[in-house]
UniProtKB/Swiss-Prot annotation:
Gene: MT-CYB
Organism annotation: Cynomys ludovicianus (Black-tailed prairie dog)
PROSITE patterns attached to this UniProt entry: CYTB_CTER (PS51003), CYTB_NTER (PS51002)
Cofactor: heme b
Residues bound to heme b b566: 97, 196
Assembly, per entry: The cytochrome bc1 complex contains 11 subunits: 3 respiratory subunits (MT-CYB, CYC1 and UQCRFS1), 2 core proteins (UQCRC1 and UQCRC2) and 6 low-molecular weight proteins (UQCRH/QCR6, UQCRB/QCR7, UQCRQ/QCR8, UQCR10/QCR9, UQCR11/QCR10 and a cleavage product of UQCRFS1). This cytochrome bc1 complex then forms a dimer.
Membrane found in the keyword field: yes
Any single biological process term in GO: mitochondrial electron transport, ubiquinol to cytochrome c
Keywords: Electron transport, Heme, Iron, Membrane, Metal-binding, Mitochondrion, Mitochondrion inner membrane, Respiratory chain, Transmembrane, Transmembrane helix, Transport, Ubiquinone
Name of this protein: Cytochrome b
Bilayer disposition of the protein: Multi-pass membrane protein
Length: 379
């Protein structure tokens, strides 16, 4: 008798993706973040769905509808804070997942990597629009500042911004369309995830050594399903500790004040996971230059397959590249800190130096150090 798992047209797709999938025998815990991102997406879609049942996307009632969810809906506070902090967990996993890809040379899987960068952009857009929905002060002013950046585009900028706003300022039309997009984008993300996995399974997973592992594969189930289950346990534990003990730790107190177009908050800043990009944006005095730097700070990831000049794929056996990689991590943490600081001395110059270093490390230092290591191999 044939196994249904291997013959059923639908179940066999799942079987080839999650059960009988040949996986390298030596992949470490850094390979857990793919499944954790899938879990984060599922949590966000489910909690978001329940929030959408009670939320109203109207400027007069949006803020009070969120208050109503927290006060009157059964476990509404839990759903709301799981959704808000779930986004933070999502981005922590995203950054670690991308960092893993950079460290171990996973970007040489060209299609998988580029789809991943597109996914990063779409998730960032989704998170930005979600931040606008509670219609607090930071929601309103964040939306105003970020959408206004598009006015830097020559010729069509102003028209484009007013088209996105649906008027001459961020108002009811903006909130309604942001809610619509925020609702639909996670499903587009889910579809892109399928494409991401499709391309990954064309080549198989990379591994810490960066060497071809075709001769040493093990089935995904039970080895990596049990390993993923541990990651899931730790992620849910971290999320619930955050949600139940300090749900507002990563939020902005200004967002508990209803949006007021006549009163600007002293420091407009996005959520913590956008601060590095915000710092890069602010470090350039020119508006268009800042916008280009902001976009390029993420888009630069697409250049990594082209900038890879090392004879080895992974950084596992490249101590010089490892040093530069950790410089980059430290620089990103510095940028994140600067993004949350006011625009004054000495933060301005620190931000400018950190932004310059960010692009220098990626475009110049990593390839140069790789070439030096290639030379050292011959000695």
């Amino acid at each position: 008798m044939t196994n249904t798992r291997k013959t059923h047209p639908l179940i066999k797709i799942i079987n080839h993706s999650f059960i009988d999938l040949p996986a390298p025998s030596n992949i470490s815990a850094w390979w857990n973040f793919g499944s954790l991102l899938g879990l984060c997406l599922a949590i966000q879609i489910l909690t978001g769905l329940f929030l959408a049942m009670h939320y109203t996307s109207d400027t007069t009632t949006a803020f009070s509808s969120v208050t109503h969810i927290c006060r009157d809906v059964n476990y509404g506070w839990l759903i709301r804070y799981m959704h808000a902090n779930g986004a933070s967990m999502f981005f922590i996993c995203l950054f670690l997942h991308v960092g893993r890809g950079l460290y171990y040379g996973s970007y040489t899987y060209f299609e998988t990597w580029n789809i991943g960068v597109v996914l990063l952009f779409v998730v960032m857009a989704t998170a930005f629009m979600g931040y606008v929905l509670p219609w607090g002060q930071m929601s309103f002013w964040g939306a105003t500042v970020i959408t206004n950046l598009l006015s830097a585009i020559p010729y069509i900028g102003t028209t484009l911004v007013e088209w996105i706003w649906g008027g001459f300022s961020v108002d009811k039309a903006t909130l309604t369309r942001f809610f619509a997009f925020h609702f639909v984008l996670p499903f587009i993300v889910a579809a892109l995830v399928m494409v991401h996995l499709l391309f990954l399974h064309e080549t198989g997973s990379n591994n810490p050594s960066g060497l071809i592992s075709d001769s040493d594969k093990i089935p995904f189930h039970p080895y990596y399903t049990i390993k993923d289950x541990l990651g899931v346990l730790l992620l849910i534990m971290a999320l619930m500790i955050l949600v139940l003990f300090s749900p507002d730790l990563l939020g902005d107190p200004d967002n508990y004040t209803p949006a007021n177009p006549l009163n600007t908050p002293p420091h407009i800043k996005p959520e913590w996971y956008f601060l590095f990009a915000y710092a890069i944006l602010r470090s350039i005095p020119n508006k268009l230059g800042g916008v280009l730097a902001l976009v390029f700070s993420i888009l630069i990831l697409m250049l990594f397959p082209l900038l890879h000049v090392s004879k080895q794929r992974s950084m596992m056996f490249r101590p010089l590249s490892q040093c530069v990689f950790w410089f980059l991590v430290a620089d990103l943490l510095t940028l994140t800190w600067i993004g949350g600081q006011p625009v004054e001395h000495p933060f301005i110059i620190i931000g400018q130096l950190a932004s310059m270093l960010y692009f220098t490390i990626m475009l110049l230092m990593l390839p140069t150090v790789s070439l030096i290591e290639n030379k050292l191999l011959k000695w």
